[in-house]
Amino acid sequence: METEGLSPMLYEDDYYYGNETGLQPCDETDWDFSYSLLPVFYMIVFVLGLSGNGVVIFTVWKSKPKRRSADTYIGNLALADLAFVVTLPLWATYTALGFHWPFGSALCKLSSYLVLLNMFASVFCLTCLSFDRYLAIVHSLSSAKLRSRSSIIVSLAVIWLFSGLLALPSLILRDTRVEGNNTICDLDFSGVSSKENENFWIGGLSILTTVPGFLLPLLLMTIFYCFIGGKVTMHFQNLKKEEQKKKRLLKIIITLVVVFAICWLPFHILKTIHFLDLMGFLELSCSTQNIIVSLHPYATCLAYVNSCLNPFLYAFFDLRFRSQCFFFFGFKKVLQGHLSNTSSSLSAQTQKSEIHSLATKV
C-alpha cells in the first residue's frame, strides 16, 4: 500500500514532524511490513500500560491515609501514562489502515494532544520524583517544607499546567486532510506560516520537545541520582550487614536513569538529525534518509514502551508499594509469606532500619 504524498519522515507518531519538508526527493520507503507489525506493538503497550498504570492509580488512591510524597508523584505519573495509552488503539488502527485516519478532526487533535501531554507530564513527574528522593535521602532533615503536602500539590499543578501549555501546538495545529486516497492526521501550518517558513516552525517545535522534554530532565535526574548514590555509599560504607541493601538501592537508581535514556534517546537522536537536515546543517543522502525513515517508527515504539515500564520501575521495585498492592488486591497470603521471608533474613536492627527507610526515605 502506498502513502501518496505522505513523507515517511512524518511517521505520524512523531507529532511535530511536518509533511514533505526538508527532505530531498527520494524513493519511498516500503511500509508494508510496518503496517502489520507496528499495530501489534501498539496493542501490547496498550494492554500492559492500561493494566499496569491502572493498578498503580488504584493502589495510590486506596492508600490515601498512608500516602507518601513519592506515592503522589507515582500516581500522577501513572495517570499521565494512562491518558496516553488509551489513545493507542486509534493510532494502531491508523497505522494498520496505511496512515488513514477514519476518526475525524476532533479525535485527531485530542489524541495528538494527549500524546504530547503525556510526554511532558511523564518526564516532569519523573524529574520531581527524583528530586523528592534526593531531598528525602540527601537533605532528610532540612527538606520538610519542600516535601510537605501543600508543596507537592503546587508542584503537581505546575507540572500539569506547564505540560498542557507545551503540548498546545499539537492541539492547535494538528488536523485532518485528504492526501491521495487517505485522510491523514497531520500538522497544518497554513494558518500561522507561509510554506517557505514551515521549516522554522518545525525546527522550533522539535527543539521544544527535545530540550525541556528530554535533555534537561535527563540531566537533572542524573545529577540527583549521583548525589543519592554518593549519600547511600557514605551511609553504608561501614555497615557490612547493609552491603546488599546498598547494592540494591544503587542498582535501582542506575536502572531508573538508564531505562529512561534507552527508551527515549533513539527517538530524540533521529528527530535531531532530521532537524539538522531540515535547517541545512546536514546534507543527508537518500540512503541515509531511508535508514532514518525506517528506524524512526521503531524508535517511537521504544519511547512508548516507557509508558508501560514505569509502573514496574517506579512502583513495584518499592517494597512498601508492592506490599500495598498485595494487600488491596487480596493477596494476603502472598504478603504474609513475603514478610515472613523478609523477617527470617533480617536481624532486628536491620528490620528497624528497613522500616524507617521505607517510611521516610523512598
Curated annotation (Swiss-Prot):
Stated name of the protein:
Apelin receptor A
**Name of the gene encoding the protein in the UniProt record:** aplnr-a
Q: What family does the Swiss-Prot or TrEMBL record give for this protein?
A: Belongs to the G-protein coupled receptor 1 family.
This protein's record includes keyword ATP-binding: no
Keywords assigned:
Angiogenesis, Cell membrane, Developmental protein, Differentiation, Disulfide bond, G-protein coupled receptor, Gastrulation, Glycoprotein, Membrane, Receptor, Transducer, Transmembrane, Transmembrane helix
What's a single GO CC term here? external side of plasma membrane
Give the transmembrane ranges: 38-58, 77-97, 111-131, 152-172, 200-220, 249-269, 297-317
Q: CDD domains, alphabetically?
A: 7tmA_Apelin_R
Kindly give the membrane topology term recorded for this protein: Multi-pass membrane protein
Disulfide bridges in this chain: C26-C286, C108-C185
Q: Which residues are glycosylated?
A: N19, N181
Q: Which residues lie on this side of the membrane: Cytoplasmic?
A: 59-76, 132-151, 221-248, 318-362
Record's function text? G protein-coupled receptor for peptide hormones apelin (apln) and apelin receptor early endogenous ligand (apela), that plays a role in the regulation of normal cardiovascular function and fluid homeostasis. When acting as apelin receptor, activates both G(i) protein pathway that inhibits adenylate cyclase activity, and the beta-arrestin pathway that promotes internalization of the receptor. Also functions as mechanoreceptor that is activated by pathological stimuli in a G-protein-independent fashion to induce beta-arrestin signaling, hence eliciting cardiac hypertrophy.
Hey, what tissues is this thing expressed in? Expressed in all blood vessels including the posterior cardinal vein, intersomitic veins and the vitelline vein network. At the gastrula stage, exclusively expressed in the mesodermal layer and at the neurula stage in the lateral plate mesoderm. Larval expression is observed in the endothelium of the primary blood vessels and the forming heart.
Q: Where does this protein reside within or beyond the cell? A: Cell membrane
Extracellular face of the membrane: 1-37, 98-110, 173-199, 270-296
Q: Which organism encodes this protein?
A: Xenopus laevis (African clawed frog)
Q: Which Pfam families match?
A: 7tm_1 (PF00001)
A GO term, aspect molecular function? C-C chemokine receptor activity
Does this UniProt record's set of keywords contain RNA-binding?
no
GO:BP terms for this protein?
Answer: angiogenesis; apelin receptor signaling pathway; blood vessel development; branching involved in blood vessel morphogenesis; calcium-mediated signaling; cell differentiation; gastrulation; heart development
Matching InterPro entries, A to Z? Answer: ATII_rcpt, CCR1-9-like, GPCR_Rhodpsn, GPCR_Rhodpsn_7TM
